[in-house]
Regions:
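A short, N-terminal "cap"/entry segment at the start of jelly-roll beta-barrel domains
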Residues: 1-57, 131-147
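A short beta-loop-beta micro-motif enriched in histidine and acidic residues
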Residues: 30, 43-48, 58-74, 87-88, ...
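A short hydrophobic beta-strand segment most commonly corresponding to one strand
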Residues: 48-52, 100, 113-131
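Short acidic-glycine-tyrosine-enriched beta hairpin
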Residues: 87-105
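Conserved catalytic-core motifs of eukaryotic protein kinase domains, centered on the activation segment
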Residues: 88, 111-112
Length: 147
């Protein structure tokens, strides 16, 4: 159960989110991912969002070139791996890796493992995403194989 208690000093709230408190949802930014809200946007009055994201479908199209309109963003890979283009550089992000993605940085997620999962923290909670022209070609993704 999520417990939220308002504090007078900061107008922020305490939040405790357990794995069964919030479901995995498919109505997030990308339809090939599943998202699990961790209650942080509500607890911070929209200052920050924290959610878990995991692979739902194979990386056939990727995210397209884009950047986020935000003040702060980090991604902590908790399982699997993903390959990004950060501007014109291929970057492999594996379980345990943490990325600070500066505001406005052009990127493209083009490949990931079936078990890929990450924690994403962004400020503000209602950050925007802007599609842009990319600086280079994208390498091919790795097809998933049936187990």
């Amino acid at each position: 159960m999520t417990v939220i208690t308002k504090t007078k000093e900061s107008a922020l709230h305490f939040s405790h989110n357990k794995p069964d408190d919030t479901p995995w949802r498919s109505d997030g930014l990308r339809d090939f991912f599943l998202y699990r809200d961790l209650g942080i946007a509500k607890a911070t009055n929209g200052k920050v969002i924290a959610h878990l994201v995991k692979a739902n479908k194979p990386p056939t199209e990727g995210t397209g070139w884009h950047h986020h309109v935000c003040e702060f963003q980090i991604v902590l890979r908790t399982k699997g791996w993903a390959k990004f283009m950060y501007e014109d550089k291929v970057t492999l992000v594996e379980a345990g890796d943490c990325i600070h993605q500066r505001p406005g940085m052009t990127h493209y997620l083009f490949d990931y493992s079936p078990d890929m999962e990450y924690l994403e923290i962004v400020s503000p909670a209602d950050f925007g995403t802007v599609e842009v022209e990319g600086p280079c070609e994208i390498p091919p993704s790795t097809p998933w194989t049936e187990k």
